[in-house]
Amino acid sequence: EHLEWAGTGMELFLGFVMVILLFGLPYFGLSYVAQALIARGYEAIGAGLGAIALISIFYLGGVARFRALRYRLSRTRWRSIRGGSDSGGFLFGLSYMWKTMVGWLPLGLLIPWSMTSLWNERWSKMSFGPFAFEADAEAGGVFARFLLFYLAPFVMFVGMLIMGGMGMLAGYGIGGENGRAIGGIVLFFYLGLGLIAVAFYAKFYREVVGATRWRSLHFSFEASTMDWVKLLIGDALLVVFTLGLGFVFLSYRHWKFFMTHLEAGGEILLDELTQSQTRTAKHGEGLLDAFDMGAI
C-alpha cells in the first residue's frame, strides 16, 4: 500500500506569505533602522539591533527545520492515518541555537554531536498515528569521517610546507607549466576536501536514519558516498545547462533520491493503529522555503 500526500500548493503559498508578513518585513525593517542609526553615529544601538536581527534569523532557522518536518508528516497518509507533532518547535529553536554554538566552540570538534543530538531531539518529538518516533543516533559512529574532513586541510598545509622546505616548490610562478601545477594543487585540494565532506555526510545520514525507529519498524538509508557524488554532479549539470532554470527541479531529484535509498523493515500490527491526535496546521510551513533550505 502506498503512502499518500495530502498537502496542497495553496497551503505552501499561504505559509510563505505568512513568513514574509510576520518575519520578513520586520527583519528588513529592523536591519534598515540599524543601518540608519549607525550612519547617524549611534553605533552601539545600531549594532545591537543588527545583532538582534541576526539572532532572530538563527533562532527561526531551527524553528523552520522542526515545523517543516511536522508539516510533511501531518500531510502524509497511510490508510488515512497521518503523522505530526504537538510541539510547535519553538523550544527546539532554542536547542538548535545552543547546540549549534556548542558544536562550533571547541574548534568545531563537537559538530557531529550537535548534528546527531538535534536529529534525535527533532524526530523524538514526532509521531505517526498513536506512536512516537524514537531516535538515538550517536556521534561516535560518524566522528572518524568528520575527523578526516577536519584534519585534511592541516595535513595538506603541512605537506606543502614540507615540499617547500625540500625545494620541490621552488621557482613556481603563476604562469606556464608551473602555474598549471599550482592550479592543479589548488583544484585537488578543493575537490578532495569536497569529496571527504560528502563521505562524511553520507555516513552521517546512514547513521542517523539507521538509529530512527517507529514502534517495531526500523529504517535504513543505503546511499553510498558515490551515490551522493552522482546526485550532486547531476544537480550542478542540471542547473548549469538550463541556465539556472533547472534549480526548481532539484527538490524533486532530492526527494526521489531519498525515497529510492530509504528502506524500512519490521512488523506493523494494524489493530493497534489509530488516528493521530496531533494538531494540524491550516497552512504550509513557509519558513524553510523562505530561508532557502534544502528539502532533505
Task: Give, region by region, the residue ranges found by the protein language model.
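Juxtamembrane inter-helical linkers in multi-pass membrane proteins
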Residues: 1-2, 73-90, 120-142, 206-228, ...
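Hydrophobic alpha-helical transmembrane segments
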Residues: 13, 48-52, 93, 143, ...
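Intrinsically disordered cytosolic tails
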Residues: 191-296
